[in-house]
Each structure stands twice: as structure tokens, then as C-alpha cells.
């Protein structure tokens, strides 16, 4: 979906396909047929943006076989789909029964992360629509925080500088500008937008910036205006924003709230949980840890890294951080010029929701994704953007 900003620039809205992950190219093609095109049809649009997640095997198949890449591009066009952004965070296995900490490997101190991201950039350059010259890729925020020392930090910094050089060369070759964005996430070396400033300014290249995930920002209790102002003052570009909402519990000390939260403690994904105290942010690596005894202070609200559907907040006594998303979006695209032109709805946890909230089959999932995109579209038009055909 494309929108015209009042300044005349085009803002792209997509949804991320990691909600129905596929490990192979054949799986990606099936995904377009079974999921993405049905969402487009529900929206009644001739064109729908998708943020592709390409696992390592799918990416390698595309980067080593020009015919396969052309075939994917043709299939996208045939189904009324377009790609201007990729989710390069998970490397493989995102559809596994247990993902948890595995999603953080390989990290940016491992040469394979550089090679995978460079391959994604080459693929994206070949998938961009003819009238689009800029693409974006979101990626791991350096590494999970443990066992990350000065030596690994220097290796990661060197890898990002090397990537920037390769992206320069890619534009010289293809005429397509691809940029890569670190996506701050609770528990990682770069947990917040403020944490991103030092490593990104150390890299010192405008092709390497930040992806603002509104669920992650909310989970860390960041104030949107302050976070985005700090990035602007530091000269860190917002390359992409993922529109998502976290799980919010206003009164976590109450037994009924604990019971409601427990329904979201599931074995597949990591649900980092945070609370803001007078001594600073406190947290646990997972929701079940927070619910166990007194691992986390409960005098104030808790927020958990569980991407809940944008249009359907959990029932009381829980809610979502949708107001934070709205504030971030207002700051990003509600001003005289957009701070980013790539927006991606990312709710990958539909099948991890409590059983009674999960979609039953492909049709209900497509309905839900279409409803999320409709909400995002309405937020954008309320900010003065006009949807393009």
C-alpha cells in the first residue's frame, strides 16, 4: 500500500510475512498464493506491500540463481504484491516449535550475519518495483546481551562498516539504494533507541540506521517524542518502522491480572517483560519468569514483548500499547516531512495467542491481517496522508 505524504513523497505500508514463515523458496511462493494475495483481495486493493522474511536457504537460492529471482519477482507482480522492505532479523527456524533465544544467532560478531544480510540486499535490489529505488532491511540489534565483550563489539562494528561499503557498491551496480536498520529489542545489546546511538554513530554511514519497532519501544517504556528527538539530534536515520503493539498490564499485583498474563506465557517465543521503577527499568527475559514469585516488582505496570493484534486489544484486565504506536507514527509521518518512508505491520504471534484468540484457519488469519492493515491505513489518512491506487 502506498500513500502520498503532504510533502509529495511516497510512504510505503506493508505487512511482514514472518507471521507465516517459510524456510525455502518453494515455501515463499506458496506463502504468496495462500496468504498474501488473499489479504490483498480482502482489502480490495490492486497492490499490497509485503515485508518478506527470507530464511537463509531461501535467500541463498535467490542470490545464486538469477532465474529464480526473476521468477519470484514475476510471481509478486502476478499476485498484485510488491516488496520494498525485508525482515532480516531471524536467520532460520522462525517457524520452529521453540524459537526463544535462537532468533539471536548468528549475531553481528559472526561472519555469517554479514554474508546473509549482504545476500538479502542483493535479492531486494532485484525485487524492488521499477518505480522504486530505495529498499530497507531490518536486522538484529548486534547481539543478545550476554557474552558480548569489547572484542565482539569491534568485530560487529567492522562487519557493519563492511556491509555499508558493499551497499555502496550495490547501488553503483544496480542503481538501487538498500539500507539496513538495527532493530532495538529488550534483552539485546541494543535494547532501546538510546542504546543504538553510540554503535550507529561509530559505524558512521547513512546506509546503516535504525528500525523503530513500536512494540519494543513500548516494552522498554520509552517516551516516543524523546526517543525520536534523540535519534534526530544524533543524526541516526530512521530507515524503517515496524508497527506493533505490546501486552500491557496496569496492575500486575492483582491475582486476576497474573492469571490473565499467564495465558500469554507460551513456549515458542521469548516475551521479555519490563517495568519502570524509580531506580530505572527492571525486567526478566521471559513472561513466565516475571510471573514466578517476586522476580519483577509489581507496584507499577508491566509490559511484555508479545506482539498483539493491532485492531484487537486483549480483554480486560489487560490491554495493548497501541497508543504508543499512534504517538510514534504521528512523530514519524505526521510532520512536514516523513522521518521514514517504510512502515511494516509486524504481528507474528497470531498462532502463539491464547487458544481462544487464535485464528482458525487461513481465512480468519487473512481477515485479521487485513483488519490490522486497515487500522494502520486509517491512522495514516488521519495524519493527512492520501492512499494511492
Residue ranges and their predicted role:
Residues 1-126, 135, 359-389:
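N-terminal pre-domain/capping segments
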Residues 1-5, 97-210:
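Active-site acidic/histidine proton-transfer and metal-coordination neighborhood
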Residues 11-18, 46-52, 83-88, 133-139, ...:
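Hydrophobic faces of well-ordered beta-strands that scaffold small-molecule active sites
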Residues 21-30, 54-68, 145, 187-191, ...:
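Acidic-and-aromatic substrate-binding clefts and catalytic sites of carbohydrate-active enzymes
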Residues 41-44, 75-80, 123-132, 166-178, ...:
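A structural motif corresponding to the C-terminal end of an alpha-helix
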Residues 90-99, 138-147, 215-221, 242-265, ...:
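Flexible glycine/acidic-rich beta-alpha junction loops that bind and position SAM and/or redox cofactors
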Residues 166-288, 299, 308:
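Acidic/histidine-rich catalytic cores of soluble enzymes
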Residues 287-385:
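Flexible, acidic glycine-rich loops studded with aromatic residues
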